Amino acid sequence: MANNNQKAAPVEEQQVTKTEAFFEKYQKAIIGGVVAVIVIIVGVILFNNYYLQPRADKASTELAKSQELFDQQQYDKALVGFQQVAADYSSTDAGNLAQLYIGICQANLGKWQEAVNALEQFSGKGDQMISPAAEGALGNAYANLNQLDKAVEHLKKAAKMADNNSLSPTFLIQAGEMLESQGKKDEALKLYQEVKEKYFQSMQYQSIDKYIERASN
């Protein structure tokens, strides 16, 4: 029994080393990719069109003040405002949106557990952009906590929710790379093949063959 444990330990250590090497190589892309998507979507589309609350509404007005700080990348100051909106207007759309902003702020500040906590509380509306982007951000937050199984689960869910050329390939490739880092090449290959077969009008389609080739070897 002791010998079996001793044999298992090096395997586990090798897996941890491979995972660390993966994040060392891809961390900037993992952190930046989805967060950038969310910032663009939230800033340009969501606040003006998705929630459709009057600017005179107090909750929306308070949210807008924090959004200005967010747009200036003053995430620590914006975070305080969003947390206040979430606390004061928890039952409103503005309060719900504040949770998403809180999660993104925490991610930008490198506070990944806090980001997870906030993003878990955000309630999507079944759309094909904001809700899956938030789900993808949650997956990335879990990845940065080295909880890769949960990360892959949420990224795959995000890709399915979006089912479009803009977001799905990004999430599928991220999930695939994480699976590769765990030695699960067969599972990763399926995700890459899904990008090739379903999202041939996406930007990622141009480079998907290299992922397929890597996972096939």
Residue ranges and their predicted role:
Residues 1-36:
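N-terminal positive-inside, membrane-proximal cytosolic segments immediately preceding the first
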Residues 75-76, 112, 148, 185:
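TPR-repeat structural position
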